[in-house]
Amino acid sequence: MIGALESGKPAFAAFAPPEPSAALDFAGSAYDGLVFEAEHKPWDAVNLRDSLQYLLDRRRIFESGTLAPSPTPFVRVPVNGAEQGQWHAKQALDLGAYGIVWPHVSRVEEARNAVA
């Protein structure tokens, strides 16, 4: 994802449920990124962890000469507005996500909370 953006090329990503079968389907894809959609599903850290592991194609990483996985994993966390649920983002990053997609952030206070 970063390589495409640094070279000025468009980066393409897809959305998928945080399930190992979806991760396996996308592991060898040509997408630059994959967003695991965790906003509209019950939060399941074990399923997310397994999905992040199944997404890694270690041979592809080795052959690329960089430690950056392709597709780069992101997680769309549950709403972070009034609930102030940063713990979802922290847990997703701890499990191996490379980035967070914050839904429904519409006020400055919510944006500050998201990056606090």
Describe each PLM feature range.
Residues M1-A116:
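Expand to "…catalyze enediolate/carbanion chemistry for C-C bond making/breaking, isomerization
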